[in-house]
């Protein structure tokens, strides 16, 4: 148990940064053994999804530390054009795609970097259905980024919103 106002102990750090054993996550473990994956993720900026995603793909969050505050969502569209890993792959002649869920309607990755990725929206941003088809046929690009669905019954591995409140003892939480 963490103590308020006290420096965490080494054991408490281990709990916070702990993970799962391969046996606990057989599907992910199988994927990790067969493909290049990140098994130790350290955020470029300790913040929310958009700044972290931007830092991951473009090595900058443009100084933004929140998804929406201090400029709204428009700040992402108005951000300076900054090359992304996708642009570098394009320059190197390597294939790439961003796969996103149809329910989301647009790729957040594409929106965050619209200034430099808009020319590729029709050619390199595809549905998860297309991902399944590409994978089944053995036609995945050299680099694939699978974007989780972050709205409409999300599958982004964050805990569901309001889960405790919806449970049997929700009134007690």
Predicted regions and their residues:
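N-terminal pro-sequences and low-complexity stem/linker regions of secreted or lumenal proteins
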Residues: 1-173
């Amino acid at each position: 148990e963490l103590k308020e106002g006290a420096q965490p102990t080494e054991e408490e750090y281990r709990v916070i940064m702990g993970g799962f054993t391969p046996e606990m996550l057989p599907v992910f473990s199988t994927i990790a053994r067969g493909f290049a994956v990140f098994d130790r993720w350290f955020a470029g900026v300790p913040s929310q999804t958009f700044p972290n995603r931007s830092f991951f793909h473009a090595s900058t969050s443009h100084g933004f530390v929140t998804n929406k505050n201090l400029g709204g969502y428009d700040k992402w569209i108005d951000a300076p054009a900054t090359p992304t890993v996708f642009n570098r792959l394009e320059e190197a002649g390597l294939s790439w795609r961003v796969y996103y869920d149809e329910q989301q309607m647009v790729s957040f990755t594409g929106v965050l970097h619209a200034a430099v990725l808009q020319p590729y929206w029709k050619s390199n941003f595809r549905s998860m259905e297309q991902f399944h088809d590409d994978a089944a046929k053995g036609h995945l690009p050299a680099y694939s980024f699978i974007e989780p669905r972050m709205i409409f019954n999300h599958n982004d591995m964050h805990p569901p919103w309001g889960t405790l409140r919806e449970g049997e003892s929700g009134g007690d939480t």
